[in-house]
Each structure stands twice: as C-alpha cells, then as structure tokens.
Amino acid sequence: MSQPITRENFDEWMIPVYAPAPFIPVRGEGSRLWDQQGKEYIDFAGGIAVNALGHAHPELREALNEQASKFWHTGNGYTNEPVLRLAKKLIDATFADRVFFCNSGAEANEAALKLARKFAHDRYGSHKSGIMAFKNAFHGRTLFTVSAGGQPAYSQDFAPLPPDIRHAAYNDINSASALIDDATCAVIVEPIQGEGGVVPASNAFLQGLRELCDRHNALLIFDEVQTGVGRTGELYAYMHYGVTPDLLTTAKALGGDFPVGALLTTEECASVMTVGTHGTTYGGNPLASAVAGKVLELINTPEMLNGVKQRHDWFVERLNTINHRYGLFSEVRGLGLLIGCVLNADYAGQAKQISQEAAKAGVMVLIAGGNVVRFAPALNVSEEEVTTGLDRFAAACEHFVSRGSS
C-alpha cells in the first residue's frame, strides 16, 4: 500500500519554485473542486485561465479516452489525423494560414520570437534583430521569453540574457514609438496583461503598434496565451480589437485541461521556416490534439462566446456590490472572464492574503501581482456557481477587513 501524500511532502521533495496552497485538490467537476478532506471549493482560478470548460468535462474525457484507446505518440517524424484536424479548425477560425504546435505558452512564444528573428534575418539581414516588448509583461519562463517579459524579478538572476530586447511602457504608444526603429524585427504584446495586473490594452494602442510595425517592417506578435480561446468573449482578443497580428500564440484554454500550445501565422511569415529550423518532440501529439479539437468545437459557438459576455456582467455587478460594502478595490477591470480587482491604497500589496482568505471560505481565486485579485473561471461557469462563489468571496473580504489589513 502506498504511503499517504500530504502537503508537507511538497516541501520535502519538490524544487521550491512554487508555494502552493495548504490543501491538495483530489477531484473536480465543472467549477467545483474537492480536497483530500472532502472540502468543496468553487474554482474561479481555472488553473490560471486553463480550465475553460471546467474540470473533467464529459466530452473532453470522451475525446481523450477515444484517442487514448488508439495511440498516444509517434514523434515529429510522422503526422497524425487529430493534429491536422486541429490545424484546419484554427486556420478556418482565424487569420492564420499555418500552425506550429507545441506544449505550452512559453514554447509558443519562443517559437514566435525565433520565427520573427529568422524572418528579419532572411529578408533584411542580420542587423534587424531587435525585439520590443513591454514593462510588466509576461511571456513565459524560457530564457528568451523571460527576457522578453518586462518583469526583472523573473529574469535578473539568469544573466547574461539574450540581447536586443527593449521594453516600452504598456498602453503608451509614444513610448513604443521612441523605442522602435528599422533594426526592430518584432513587437510582442499581450492584448490584456494578465500577470501584469489584468490591464486591457486600448484599441488605439494596439492599432498604433500595428502601424509602427508596418512602418518599420517589423512583425506584430500577439501573445494570446491567457486571452485566447473565448476568454474575452471572442475566440481571440484580436477579434475584439479589430487589429490583426502577424503571429499569434495560444495555449492554456486551447487544451481545456490538457497541455498544448500553438503558434499561428501567415503563409508569408511561415515561408522562412524549413525542415529542422525549429521543432518539438511532443508538440501536436494525438492526445493533446484530440482534446484541443473538441475544446474548439465546444467554445467557438455564438452561444458560448455570448455567454462569456453575460457571465462578465454577473461577476462585475456582484464584485462592485462587494466592493461597495467593504471598500477594498479602486477598480474592477478586464474583458470577458479575465477580471482583475485592483486593491486601493489602504490594502496595497495584500492580494495574496485575500486569496488565502478566499480559499478558507471555499473559493479559489488568483492574484496578478501584489495589488490585484484575479478571476479566470471556466467559460461555462453556471449562475449558481457564480452566486455561491462570490458569496464565499464576500465572506472572505468581510473577514479580511474585520481582522485588519496587516
């Protein structure tokens, strides 16, 4: 008989790059989770915007089990039917002509940055290697992507970092204009900065970046790892803004619960890549592709996408009511079901404490830095689950305020 597993085992056995909650979830269904002791939680964290259809969705389980009964993996020396069907679905639903599959958002962004540099190298010469990104951005944890992310706390201990990366102020087109030049090969931007505080870009900002990229022959990369696959109420956020990138990265919700990532791009951009210029062993494996194909089928419908917008209203209305009662937040912002509650000055830096109180009350929420409580629930979360979860969140806020902010 195997030994019991406890939260303390994490501290004994794991490399300490995470500080997980004191409880261990063991079962999930829809937007509910249960821990080892049987306590129920309403899940508004969604696996950090991953569980777009909730936990253990029956049609995703069926797709996974059906493919698992056939074969799981062959490597990139062979293709497979599920990945080709998935590629066609993404192409038909977006601006893209070509797709590269991988296993995560970081890998997708790594592929995008490499493609952008190769495109510039082949078309204009090796001098055109600059990348413009934005302060407080997050693009992944590889050395290249963490350098593109504009958060020094994540990169400063890993020098020397890849060169020729500049960081402009987000939502400030004048700052971007001052840094871009003809040696810039790409601009990478999140339509909503997720880890940076749930900060939506303005339409004028993204349109301005499109114009700057066109003027300087640079590729525009939208990192839609967090905003993609219905999260904003559109299949991808670029559709909400009406600004089309040259490359788009997607992951998280694309797999529902299953690890998968993808780079979407045009025929022109893809043409610089040839056999061997990039690759991955597991990317586009049949298991991930079968699940992701079903995810797209279920999410890319008017009913689901319009439902996201309706659920946004449920959350914002209730969160504003909670805030009116307890006065914690200076702003509730975001699009669709990516929502951030910004702490006011009296409670600055204490988002983590509020999330911990929420877990005690039986609701899981995220943070986005020290000052923002973040919500990224399943896109099909029910009205009853929203009501119950936010009642628990209100109780957590009451307890947090009553015990003092220290």
Curated annotation (Swiss-Prot):
EC number: 2.6.1.81
Keywords of the record: Aminotransferase, Arginine metabolism, Pyridoxal phosphate, Transferase
Top-level taxon in the UniProt lineage: Bacteria
Xref: SUPFAM superfamilies: PLP-dependent transferases
Residues with the N6-(pyridoxal phosphate)lysine modification: 252
Gene that encodes it: astC
Organism whose genome encodes this protein: Shigella boydii serotype 18 (strain CDC 3083-94 / BS512)
Organismal lineage: Bacteria, Pseudomonadati, Pseudomonadota, Gammaproteobacteria, Enterobacterales
Protein name: Succinylornithine transaminase
Keyword match Transmembrane helix: no
